[in-house]
A protein has these predicted regions:
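Bacterial N-terminal signal peptides
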Residues: 1-5
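Immediate post-signal-peptide N-terminus of mature secreted/exported proteins
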Residues: 8-55
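Amphipathic, alpha-helical segments enriched in basic
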Residues: 10, 14-17, 21-24, 31, ...
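Leucine-rich amphipathic alpha-helices with coiled-coil/heptad-repeat character
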Residues: 39, 46, 53, 60, ...
Length: 130
């Protein structure tokens, strides 16, 4: 009689552990899905920044070669506008670098979460309730 109670308790404890592990996997999966959505948004932002940076870099490259020493006042104006373009270029390139760094961090975090999920799935076997 005592043996059957102990065996029943052990089975219940195993079921509880399994359910807790499944709950952990579901929580990690939810976190992974949210991170993947954020990653896709950041990726779209990164693509947009890349296009903008390419345009601005080309514009800045052409602006730095347009100086003419024949008219001093125009040269000063050109230099000021070039400085402005270069600062804008620098800002966009910084944003792009930050976005790329953020994407890299997100990829690493997603890989860690996926590894945790895989590890937890090894511990438990999902059984269809039929």
């Amino acid at each position: 009689m005592v043996l059957s109670v102990v065996a029943g308790f052990a089975q219940n404890a195993a079921k509880i552990d399994k359910l807790k592990e499944q709950q952990k996997v579901l929580k990690l999966t939810t976190e992974l899905n949210k991170l993947q959505l954020d990653y896709e948004k950041e990726k779209a932002n990164n693509i947009e920044l890349s296009k903008k940076a390419a345009d601005i870099n080309a514009d800045a490259n052409s602006a730095t070669t347009d100086f003419n020493t024949s008219n001093a006042s125009n040269t000063v104006k050109d230099a000021k506008s070039t400085i402005k373009k270069l600062k804008e270029t620098e800002a966009v390139n910084k944003k792009l670098a930050k976005s790329q760094k953020n994407l890299s961090k997100m990829e690493k975090k997603m890989a860690k979460i996926q590894a945790k999920i895989d590890d937890s799935n090894k511990k438990i076997k999902f059984v269809d309730n039929q």
